[in-house]
Amino acid sequence: SGSGGAAGADYIIAQGTTGKWMWRKWASGIAEMWATFDAPSLTMTSQTWGPLYTASWMGLEVNKQAREYPFAFIENPIVSATPTVGSGNIWLATNTENDIGTRLTHAPAYQCVRGSDAIVDSPQISYYVVGRYK
């Protein structure tokens, strides 16, 4: 086979950085974008969800605004969110009280959850979003 790629291969028609988001638009109508949201630390010392400890920085206005996508999708995109921390184990749960916009225009908010109290060091939520923009 040749080095020119397969017939009908998709290709990037635009890419850039908007706020926290890096993004690519593909000729086929698919778009992908990714961003990270972090905090220096997160205090999780109160049981806020039954026996579980939860906390989030997604309610901060700066984070609400930054979760707006650089452009809207035309159908609900696939959103992957991955937590990482400097120390203190967590998992993620939805945080709908801090959602704004729609699934087409904004990344969803998440909260950090754990089974015991802690101050979590350097929590970060990394988003990867893919869907149709046209």
Residue map of PLM features:
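Glycine-rich, low-complexity segments
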Residues: 1-42
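Extracellular attachment/recognition segments
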Residues: 28-134
